[in-house]
Amino acid sequence: DWKNQVIWVGTGEHNSSRSSYSGTGILKSTDLGKTWINSGLNDSHHIGKIIINPQNANEVIIGSTGHLYSNSKQRGIFKSTDNGASWTNTLFIDDSTGIIDIKVSPDNPNILFASSWKKDRKAWDFVENGNESAIYKSIDFGNSWVRITNEKNGFPSNTSVGRIGLSVFNQNIIYAVVDNQNRRPKKKEVKEELKKEDFKKITKEQLLKIDTSKLNSFLTANNFEKKYDAKSIKDLVSKEEINPSDLYTYLNEANAELFDTPVIGAEVYKSSDGGNSWQKTNQDFINDTYYSYGY
């Protein structure tokens, strides 16, 4: 709020890596950052979005994902009408679902869109999807909210919906990028061709019996250096200088090996009627966007 020399800072990393640190609520400066006060929501831990009403600077909207490693109540959307002196939780979904993104409509600042994120982070595991991951809409600058995504209007609505990012062109046109954790359909396998998975548990004897031309075709298709042809690979395996599974390890990305999750990943949806209906805009898979989770 440059007009009034007010700066708001939401503390806490809102991405959900194991290394993400929690914050201490909302910080506020009324002198362009020279001094600061804590303006509440200390138990929110992770704040991702702050929206100031362009028509009334006393009205502020906060989106919080809540505690990272445990369930908590101070999450969702909070609104202040007194410049941060007090806060009202205007959207609470449950104690493991928070708000990861909020956008205001450029042509009508009373209309807001927010995305919720269901997740359960542990030091040894991360479930980052659920039915409660959805998009909500407000027409009164955050006083009330309505869920606008469901299984009937074209938007994914199931236990595999992960993090959702929003981009709002106007009150009618909204884009959403979704981390879809549903599995991709299995490709039809051509049995005559070798695949990297074939080498995951293959024995020394089995590898040595592979047809030389077939193995050469596999090595060429997977961009092995020319010095690694079928003969040299078989020699290395025969002398036990390498294991057959080393071919799989070499080809498989470390991240893919770690998670082994052939999921759909990123999808982009568009609504042209204010969120009443949605259409997926991409036909093919959008690769190289999310490598394990979209967090």
Regions found by a protein language model. Name each.
Residues 1-295:
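Beta-propeller blade termini and top-face loops
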